[in-house]
Design a protein with these regions (language model features):
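N-terminal Rossmann NAD(P)H-binding glycine-rich loop of SDR-like oxidoreductase domains
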Residues: 1-10
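NAD(P)H-binding glycine-rich loop region in Rossmannoid oxidoreductase-like domains
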Residues: 20-80
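Conserved sequence/active-site signature of Rossmann-fold short-chain dehydrogenase/reductase
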Residues: 34, 97, 153-155
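A conserved pocket-lining segment of Rossmann-fold NAD(P)-dependent short-chain dehydrogenase/reductase
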Residues: 170-182
Length: 182
């Protein structure tokens, strides 16, 4: 997303827990969104943000903890840019919206076909709580929103166990090592 926005002439401000150098980012902010006070201090550098793309989550031991931590991260981001002239916010979640949380995978029957208008599944699901915070902030501050629920993300973050590119690379390496076709 950052690459494309930059190509289209946008000023891109990136955010992550660590201080990284991203070639497509005009400015990078290192902030731990699980810490409200630290987030607010760090996000003062994004007081001019007009569009937000929220694409992060933090895996916790239980879904109840996922709900608490991940909804707080969305809230802390928006509270940290409370004075920014935000026009639109895009939240990226995923397939667990339709299939249930990790704790409930294969325990509840999903509604099929998957439709954006389908009711939420029973049980805790941090995606739902992230959406609720987004909806609350959008209504209070007057910006538009969108939610994107891709099945698979292919990225480049080292150490991300949910990175499909890493999964395919490991599988290809095993196939090569064992002499099996890929």
């Amino acid at each position: 997303v950052g690459h494309r926005l930059k190509e289209d002439g946008w000023t891109v401000v990136s955010l992550s827990r660590s201080d990284v150098d991203l070639p497509w980012s005009d400015r990078h902010i290192a902030a731990d969104l699980t810490n409200a006070e630290a987030s607010a201090r760090a996000l003062s550098a994004a007081s001019d943000a007009t569009h937000v793309f929220f694409c992060m989550w933090s895996r916790q031991a239980t879904e109840e903890e996922n709900v608490t931590v991940n909804s707080a991260m969305v809230r802390n981001l928006f509270n940290g840019i409370a004075e920014a002239p935000v026009q639109h916010a895009a939240l990226v979640t995923g397939l667990k919206h339709y299939l249930g949380s990790f704790d409930d995978y294969a325990q509840v029957t999903p509604y099929t076909p998957f439709l954006e208008s389908s009711p939420r599944l029973p049980g805790p699901n941090f995606y739902y709580d992230q959406e609720d915070v987004l909806f609350e902030m959008a209504e209070a501050r007057g910006f538009t929103w969108s939610v994107h629920r891709p099945h698979t993300m292919i990225g480049f973050v080292i150490g991300n166990a949910m990175n499909m590119a890493v999964t395919l690379a490991i599988y290809a390496t095993i196939c090569k090592h064992t002499g099996r076709p890929f």
